Amino acid sequence: MEAEVEEEEEDMFEDAVCTTQARVNTPLSVITEAFEDLADLVKPQRSDEIDEDELRLDDFCSACTHVSVLFNCLGFAFKFAEMEYIAKVKDLVEASKTFETLHNILDLDVEKETVKTPGSHSRNLRRVRQGLDLIRAIFEQFLIADDYSLKDAATTAYTEVCAPFHTWAVRTAVYAGMYTLPTRDQLLLRLNETDQSVEKNMRRYMEASRPIIEYIDKLYIERNIKLDW
């Protein structure tokens, strides 16, 4: 009888631990873990297990679908970026039902001469890559600023990553919307993070996303496609 009671108590403890762990899975930590898993697939030390040109499109899309939450947390200022990002990811998700890898979609568009054509998978991949880089740049600027000003961080990041490729009307709307960005405390609340955890998870995302961004850039460069678009 005592043994059964002890076993039940152990089961309850294990359930409690699992529940507690589930509760600490914040949106940012989920994104970070997804990109860390993805980054492991393109790091040189994994070259004996997977060809560096064969990152699966469905795996890539699975990680990318989580990122829209971050754009949503930034509010109105990045509504355009959020809508564009979601639309492009959805297109790639559909493409993953036909194409196995990222380089498959690029090869087809190169053959058809539609790499830069609006709506092509290769163009949409390029825009998704910019979205990932924008989040990375925002985090980077946010952490190096003395006052942790999200407005300053987002303005600098947008100017660096996306502004060169957006029309005047879009740039004007984005810059005007910067004044509606949440405060630092509001952002932490939306992300369900603390001062300590947000810095840790932001740095983890920056580290994990970098090789993915470089990997995508390399796919274009190897096919003699410039990155100035």
From Swiss-Prot:
It comes from the Eukaryota. Induction: Highly up-regulated during programmed cell death (PCD) induced in acd11 mutant. GO terms for cellular component: cytoplasm; nucleus. This is ACD11 homolog protein. The keyword Transcription does not apply. Keywords: Lipid transport, Transport. It comes from Arabidopsis thaliana (Mouse-ear cress). GO terms for molecular function: ceramide 1-phosphate transfer activity. Disulfide bonds: none annotated. The lineage of its organism: Eukaryota, Viridiplantae, Streptophyta, Embryophyta, Tracheophyta. PANTHER family: ACD11 HOMOLOG PROTEIN, GLYCOLIPID TRANSFER PROTEIN-RELATED. An N-acylsphingoid base 1-phosphate binds at E84, K88, R123, R127, H166. InterPro entries: GLTP_sf, Glycolipid_transfer_prot_dom. Belongs to the GLTP family.
